[in-house]
């Protein structure tokens, strides 16, 4: 029987929180938790040895190993850490040719009742064409984790199809919104300035949210991934910000509309008198490996404070606007970039949009709405 996350199920939810949400857990779990690969000449194939290991968020089914542009190896034998008792087909550690298309793996739960499909790719680092990277938010789908409500997620198209590069709190919101349609999500598609856009709205998480002192869900969308396993245990760790980016960003532009709601509350649902809600629009460019060579992904706890941050573009005050309004934010660099590190995909870019700036700490006004469209990252032109 499926768990539907009513108030009486909170204790069970915290104990059985996985992406196959069944009350038969753990034998109904069917996830890849880690993926790793071993090759004899790893330094010739990967930019960093840590790139041979992928930590897999619970909402992710497309796994991509990034390899060097000049790498000639096409056959790999990836291995997977699975949830307890699960099996995988093709066999764990079997060798395949990844040169033409992703290899599809199916993970089946120990009890045989549930399964999940993953696509695994080995991709050479791509060179971004032109000096402007465009995000128009035209591609979105409804996703579903077993036992939860449908929710919207956004994708970007590349040479191999649609890629899940955008994260949002929609999957986490679905924990408390099991009886609501996807249109009630904090992040939904709408008609935009041109084509489609994203509407971000701060929502109530209902009785369940209040019980665990997470009474609101700010509408957010970010260039990164959302790790559902941390949504209750450590909400700040659930937002994994950024993807490798091999250009030097100079400016972020786009269009927005913003209407703040009036009543701001805190984590205890106490009304904060004389406090106004505000939105967040910012970007962070950072080194994605530390001094010891370990892979780093910034999260909600350090996205603005990490010593790995190289540059930031922050729209400190998002002025309320009823009509589509153009914005432009310039990156402020704290240090020079290393061109060799840039060439090796050693920097990541995070873009963050939120209807309530302090929503990560569950402070905000239910109903505050931020709409975003036609975002552009203007980069330094490649020197010939």
Q: Model-derived features: where do they sit?
A:
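C-terminal motif of bacterial Sec signal peptides marking the signal peptidase cleavage site
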Residues: 16-19
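Beta-rich interaction/scaffold domains
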Residues: 21-135
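Exposed low-complexity, polar/acidic, P/S/T/G-rich flexible segments that act as propeptides
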Residues: 122-124, 365-384
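Extracellular carbohydrate-recognition regions
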Residues: 125-169
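Short carbohydrate-recognition loop motifs
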Residues: 188-208
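Extracellular-facing segments of soluble proteins and assemblies that are Gly/Ser/Thr-biased and enriched
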Residues: 207-291
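Extracellular carbohydrate recognition and processing domains
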Residues: 290-343, 365
């Amino acid at each position: 029987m499926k768990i539907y996350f009513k108030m009486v199920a909170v204790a069970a939810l915290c104990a059985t929180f996985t992406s196959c949400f069944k009350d038969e857990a753990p034998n109904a779990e069917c996830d890849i938790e880690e993926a790793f690969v071993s090759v004899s000449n790893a330094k010739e194939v990967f930019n960093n040895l840590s790139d041979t290991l992928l930590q897999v968020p619970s909402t992710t089914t497309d796994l991509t190993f990034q390899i060097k542009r000049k790498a000639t190896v096409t056959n790999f034998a990836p291995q997977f850490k699975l949830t307890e008792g699960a099996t995988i087909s093709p066999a764990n550690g079997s060798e395949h040719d990844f040169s033409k298309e992703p290899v599809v793996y199916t993970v089946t739960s120990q009890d045989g009742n549930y399964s999940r499909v993953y696509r695994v790719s080995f991709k050479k680092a791509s060179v971004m064409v032109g000096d402007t990277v465009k995000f128009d938010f035209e591609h979105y789908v409804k996703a579903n984790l077993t036992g939860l409500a449908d929710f919207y997620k956004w994708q970007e198209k590349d040479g191999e199809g649609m890629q899940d590069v955008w994260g949002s709190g929609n999957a986490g919101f679905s924990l408390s919104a099991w009886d609501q349609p996807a249109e009630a999500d904090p992040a939904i598609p709408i008609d935009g300035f041109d084509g489609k856009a994203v509407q971000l709205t701060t929502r109530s998480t209902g009785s369940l949210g209040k019980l665990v002192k997470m009474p609101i869900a700010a509408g957010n969308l970010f260039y990164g991934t959302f790790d559902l396993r941390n949504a209750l245990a450590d909400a700040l760790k659930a937002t994994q910000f950024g993807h490798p980016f091999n250009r030097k960003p100079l400016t972020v532009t786009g269009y927005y509309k913003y209407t703040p709601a009036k009543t701001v509350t805190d984590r205890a649902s106490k009304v904060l008198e004389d406090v106004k809600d505000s939105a967040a629009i910012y970007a962070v460019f950072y080194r994605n490996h530390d001094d010891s060579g370990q892979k780093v992904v910034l999260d909600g706890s350090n996205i603005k404070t990490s010593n790995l941050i190289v540059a930031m573009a922050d729209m400190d005050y998002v002025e309320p606007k009823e009509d589509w309004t153009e914005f432009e934010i310039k990156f402020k660099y704290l240090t020079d970039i290393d061109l060799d590190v840039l060439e090796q995909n050693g920097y990541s870019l995070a873009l963050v949009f939120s209807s309530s700036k302090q929503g990560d700490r569950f402070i905000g006004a239910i109903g505050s709405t931020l709409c975003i469209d036609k975002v552009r990252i203007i980069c330094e032109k490649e020197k010939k």
